[in-house]
Amino acid sequence: MCEGPSRISGPIPPDPTLCPDNYRRPTSAQGRLEGNALKLDLLTSDRALDTTAPRGPCIGPGAGEILERGQRGVGDVLLQLEGISLGPGASLKRKDPKDHEKENLRRIREIQKRFREQERSREQGQPRPLKALWRSPKYDKVESRVKAQLQEPGPASGTESAHFLRAHSRCGPGLPPPHVSSPQPTPPGPEAKEPGLGVDFIRHNARAAKRAPRRHSCSLQVLAQVLEQQRQAQEHYNATQKGHVPHYLLERRDLWRREAEARKQSQPDPAMPPGHTRMPENQRLETLTKLLQSQSQLLRELVLLPAGADSLRAQSHRAELDRKLVQVEEAIKIFSRPKVFVKMDD
């Protein structure tokens, strides 16, 4: 449904066939846009068409570009991002982003390689200094023996005989080797050989071994001494330790016994009445001893009373002694028990 002329302004004109009465097209545009076959009579009459000869369309210099934009659309032109086109046409070639990190690493490696090559060429051109070996400071004042030997003057002539260490010298069990006649060296001649090449050392050592004194091995004596020491140690063990309880075990047994007694005494007696406490054993025995002494003293006084005294004073004294004896006997019976309970004071 059309509500008047279109208000869209752009390179793409609206369709004039929707509302032909609202559009005024020039004659040149009618044949190009609407077409001659439609033969729409917008604002011209048949007489003007008949009398006026048709003219060709007026095409400006930018008409081709406008037509191309109308066919392709303006969105393709507006959304061009760095040569990337959204239209059907051929797009420009996209450039790959440059990796600056790899480029920097490559340049650093090139610089390091060039620096190493310069160092190598510099080292090859200069002599290397020798590294001094470590030497203890206590040998600073000690002269080198090799240096002293090198500084000594050599022999005047090369005809002097050199002194060599023989095979049979400074060897053996520590005893001086027997003097055995050795072959005399022949005077040097024109065909003289080096010293020591004409001596049969194997035969010489065999003769020296036969003539050397034999020494008995001391292994049997050492074995006898070890066996004697073991026998004495076994006898001492049998006499002092075998069959006897060690001293530390005896002490441990006494300690356990004392701990058991203390634990037994500290436990409350089930036969003890409430409000009482058990009298210590030493106090009980001390009290019992005093009661026995009092009993013997009362019996002695009772025996010493006169038998024929019938006075009131004698009778009262006898009755008093009897009453005390009864009390002492009752107390002796009480304190003779293994456990005596005493009432605690409030």
From Swiss-Prot:
Biological process according to GO: establishment of mitotic spindle orientation; motile cilium assembly; non-motile cilium assembly
Chief localization: cytoplasm
Basic and acidic residues biased stretches: 114-125
Residue ranges with Pro residues bias: 174-190
Source organism superkingdom: Eukaryota
Residue numbers carrying Phosphoserine: 91, 136
InterPro entries in alphabetical order: Enkurin_dom, Enkurin_domain-protein
Gene Ontology cellular-component annotations: 9+0 non-motile cilium; centriole; centrosome; ciliary basal body; ciliary base; cilium; cytoplasmic microtubule; microtubule cytoskeleton
Subcellular location: Cytoplasm, Cytoskeleton, Microtubule organizing center, Centrosome; Cytoplasm, Cytoskeleton, Microtubule organizing center, Centrosome, Centriole; Cytoplasm, Cytoskeleton, Cilium basal body; Cell projection, Cilium
Positions of the UniProt region annotated as Disordered: 1-35, 114-137, 167-197, 260-280
Pfam family, any one: Enkurin
Keywords: Cell projection, Cilium biogenesis/degradation, Cytoplasm, Cytoskeleton, Microtubule, Phosphoprotein
Domain Enkurin intervals: 251-343
Region entry Required for binding to microtubules, spans: 91-171
GO molecular function list: alpha-tubulin binding; microtubule binding
Record note on quaternary structure: Interacts with alpha-tubulin. Interacts (via central region) with CCP110 (via N-terminal region); competes with CEP97 for binding to CCP110.
Function: Microtubule-binding protein which regulates microtubule organization and stability. Promotes the stability of astral microtubules and facilitates the proper orientation of the mitotic spindle. This allows the oriented division of basal keratinocytes and contributes to epidermal stratification. Required for the assembly of both primary and motile cilia. Destabilizes the interaction between CCP110 and CEP97 by competing with CEP97 for binding to CCP110 which promotes the removal of CCP110 and CEP97 from the mother centriole and allows the initiation of ciliogenesis.
Name this polypeptide is given: Enkurin domain-containing protein 1
